[in-house]
Swiss-Prot record:
AMP binds at T31, R36, L57, L58, V59, Q91, R154, R165. The lineage of its organism: Bacteria, Bacillati, Mycoplasmatota, Mycoplasmoidales, Mycoplasmoidaceae. One of its GO terms (biological process) is AMP salvage. This is Adenylate kinase. NCBIfam families: adk. Pathway: Purine metabolism; AMP biosynthesis via salvage pathway; AMP from ADP: step 1/1. GO terms for molecular function: adenylate kinase activity; ATP binding; zinc ion binding.
Length: 215
């Protein structure tokens, strides 16, 4: 199975990716991980890639496509999830030239829920445990339950940054939903309630692909 995961920041892509890896044996491929590995291992195009990232610039589609192809070539014999790897129509067009995806899974969440998930997120400065002040708050405000260290809010989770991320998402990524819909590859799942999301995924995989959990 080759699966593209779509959805706005905070929609639950990381959560559902972990679930699919553990319960269905899929390999998780994300742009962030691929970029970090390319730079750390000094892989093909690493210097050009590092020059963009170190300046805080968006990596151009052409360079992203080259690096993504290199990663995909190593995993073509496996079932995998592409998480955040396809962000523009140009990238989707390129992907279609090297493989035929089975499913584009779109995680739908209302904007106000996304905002609460992201702005409410806090991370332990030591153990990196993740909390949310709205949904899973620590017992003591701003203090980690496990080690007593202070909780921090990532810069990316501040409202001003989130508003900008959502603007970029709507401009570049929302057209992908229509793109895969026209190809009859798109399946939308409401992920507002994360507790129901796993069951919805299980039902989809059984009904559409006759796949059951390996665990």
């Amino acid at each position: 199975m080759k699966l593209v995961l779509l959805g706005a920041p905070g929609c639950g892509k990381g959560t559902i990716s972990d679930y699919l890896v553990k319960n269905y044996g899929l390999v998780h491929l994300s742009t962030g991980d691929i970029f970090r590995q390319t730079i750390d291992q000094k892989g093909p195009y690493w210097e050009e890639l590092k020059s963009y990232i170190s300046k805080g610039l968006l990596v151009p589609d052409e360079l992203t496509n080259k690096i993504l192809k290199n990663a995909l070539d190593k995993n073509m014999d496996k079932s995998f999830i592409l998480d955040g790897c396809i962000r523009t129509i140009a990238q989707a067009d390129f992907l279609s030239t090297i493989l035929d995806i089975d499913l584009a899974l779109y995680l739908e969440v209302p904007f106000d829920v996304l905002e609460k998930r992201l702005t409410g997120r806090r991370i332990c400065s030591k153990c990196k445990r993740i909390y949310n002040i709205h949904y899973s708050a620590p017992k003591k405000e701003d203090i980690c339950d496990d080690d007593g260290e202070f909780l921090i809010q990532r810069k990316d989770d501040q409202k001003e940054i989130i508003d900008e991320r959502m603007k970029v998402y709507r401009t570049n990524s929302e057209p992908l939903i229509k793109y895969y819909e026209k190809l009859n590859k798109l399946v939308a799942i409401n992920s507002e309630n994360l507790d129901d999301l796993e069951k919805n995924i299980d039902d989809l995989f059984i009904n559409k692909f006759n796949l059951r959990k390996i665990a």
